[in-house]
Amino acid sequence: MIVTGSQVRQGLNTWFVLPLRRTAIGLGCAGVATLFSACGQTQALITNQTIQGFVDQVVVPSYVSVAAGATQLEQALQTYQQAPTAANLEAARQAWRVARDRWEQTECFAFGPADSEGFDGAMDTWPIDRQGLKTAAAQPVEQREDSRKGFHAIEELLFAATEPTLSDRQHLVILATDLTKQAQGLVTRWQQASDQPAYRSVLLSAGSTDSAYPTLNAAGTEIVQGLVDSLSEVASEKIGGPLETQEPDRFESFVSRNTLSDLRNNWTGAWNVYRGQRSDGVAAGSLQQRLQQQHPVIAQQLDQQFATARQALWAIPEPIETNLASPRGKVAVLTAQTAIAAVSDTLERQVLPLVQ
């Protein structure tokens, strides 16, 4: 999660700053209440089956996978703390990459508890407070600013140019333990009721008068807006910032050289939401299938744009951090940025109005 403003491309080489829309539910209506009362369901695009597929085939399994990855990272760092060998260091780094990849696939549904209860910030704030992190080892994690914990704080210590010291290794275990706690907490909030209903139930109750989503389209708007925001962030900020300034250290996972994997997993997460499931094939009632049935021209356009964006992302030479300055690298990055922005634009201009 990047917490600064975003750059967007205008023409080929001109850039300007726009704010990211991270939590907006409605466009074209003045406020949430107006959205629910005034934005009619002119198209029966979103069904209960669409929402259930999104929740049970994508969101919950993805978060369960993230929690498992965080647990494995914590265990790998505990092993490395006890036996600081080169092999254990590499195993811990690989565990971080795996957990990170899984997390990046959830960027397009970072609403609900991830946003409102602070899980996203606690796990993925960037940039981090590097100076503060150096002095934070003795501070309880729950008392820290988000910029001193999470994936990128672990990355900073684990992938440093010099091997982690004893103090660093101890600190890494503390950070990983908190990451696991946050990831498991996010799973719990989606699956289990406490003083509040499970967020899974909140979304599945869409269309009920007492629901946070009084119409199916209200839930559909949340889902589509999440896709728009995530892909817009990838194009305008995660890629756009470093591309504009030609400063590789502005890539979010610069220290680990994992940025390209981040971006590819952002694409994969959006593709999973569009298809309504994480495995191969199209889930019944998915956004993709509903568009194919009701708006086949839009569906065909999106399918092609997703494919083009994937091809462009996978064509960027690795690592992106060291290839940005090369002519080939710059062209490849710009091509990918343009392709991803096209997907976001179609979702925003052609799909979002159908669910408002």
UniProtKB/Swiss-Prot annotation:
InterPro entries: Imelysin-like (IPR018976), Imelysin-like_IrpA (IPR034982), Imelysin_sf (IPR038352). Residues 75-145, 240-310 are annotated as: Hydrophilic. The iron-regulated protein A is one unit of the protein complex CPVI-4, which is synthesized under iron deficient conditions. This is Iron-regulated protein A. Induction: By iron deprivation. IrpA occurs under iron-deficient growth conditions in cyanobacterium Synechococcus and disappears in cells recovering from iron starvation. It seems to be involved in iron acquisition, uptake or storage. Residues 1-44 form the signal peptide. It is found in: Cell inner membrane. The gene is irpA. Pfam families: Peptidase_M75 (PF09375). Keywords: Cell inner membrane, Cell membrane, Iron, Membrane, Signal, Transmembrane. Transmembrane segments: none annotated. GO terms for cellular component: plasma membrane.
